[in-house]
Amino acid sequence: MNRLSLVRYTSAVALGLSTLWSAAVCAAEDAGAFDKIQQIRAGDLNIGYVDIGPRDGQPVILLHGWPYDIQSYAQVAPALAQKGYRVIVPYLRGYGTTRFLSAGTPRNGQPSAMAADIVHLMDALNIRQADLAGFDWGARTADIVAALWPQRVKSLVSVSGYLISSQQIGEKPLPPQAELSWWYQFYFATPRGEAGYRQNTHDFAKFIWHQASPQWQFSDATFAKTARALDNPDHVAITISNYRWRLGLEKGEAKYAGYEQRLAVLPPITVPTITLEGANNGAPHPAPASYRAKFTGKYEHGDLPGAVGHNPPQEDPTAFVQAVVDADRL
């Protein structure tokens, strides 16, 4: 990260809750939108989403990860709306109020399917181009949209950088310490793991939150707001499918095969991008130097200091808002 970026993101952290609370007070009506979920048919789904800010503002789509939900952006979205952005925060397939339109559609969690969902959502909302930002599954989804549909992406904010992969890569063993960090992926590869996650979804998710962000002191009330979204009837199936697909244990759907072939060569991302990394990210993640060359357009990287872990928009919303604004202006 260049010196200017270092000052910028460190300053954003220093501003802390004062800036955030100011935005929250000014945007109380917008913040209430998180309790007023809208629904729209898009592709295979009826997608639940929040839509706040001026309708003629620059669209920003914020994508959550696993096992999180749209509440990761409960403070980011109103702050961006106050800056004039139209902010859309969808539930991914298998979360919250998002539902499949047909009982016969495979409950498929492969990454390119989730990316296609976002393109379908943009089409349904008549959004030609948007700023995309995400972490965990959301970052991977945003990366894929930027790689396959760059004309639809004005800018990108991706926590942990370039997360595009392939089944061929997923089949290759890693060093023992790295394999250990993916323990839940191997657990989900077994019938016991699927049954265990179904039986203990909330406890499992809370455990992952602690592991991924070891210094994040979230409250029971904060977790409970998200836990409800994990009660989606397709959540377990989508989760298991996602991790099994990565290991090559599921083939995925034929209609996404063309996307997967293009992603397998690890295409560059050409849109203006800011990548972020939390200093205390306890989840598996690549080193920034390892993916720098994959971003061939305007680019900056920001390291978020202190206790910030795997979920920067919820752990340090001020810095995340700054990153979205800066990426939009690159």
Residue ranges: model-predicted function:
Residues 115, 240, 317-325:
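Short, amphipathic alpha-helical "lid/cap" segments that border enzyme active or binding sites
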Residues 36-42:
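Short acidic-hydrophobic surface loop/beta-edge motif
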Residues 51-100, 291:
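Conserved HGGG/HGGXW glycine-rich cap/lid loop of the alpha/beta-hydrolase fold
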Residues 1-13:
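Bacterial N-terminal signal peptides that target proteins for export
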Residues 29-34, 45-47, 52, 59, ...:
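Flexible "cap/lid" subdomain of the alpha/beta-hydrolase fold that forms the substrate-access gate
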Residues 308-316:
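Catalytic histidine-centered segment of alpha/beta-hydrolase-like enzymes
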Residues 23-27:
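Sec/Tat signal peptide C-region and signal peptidase I cleavage site
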Residues 10-22:
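Bacterial N-terminal signal peptides
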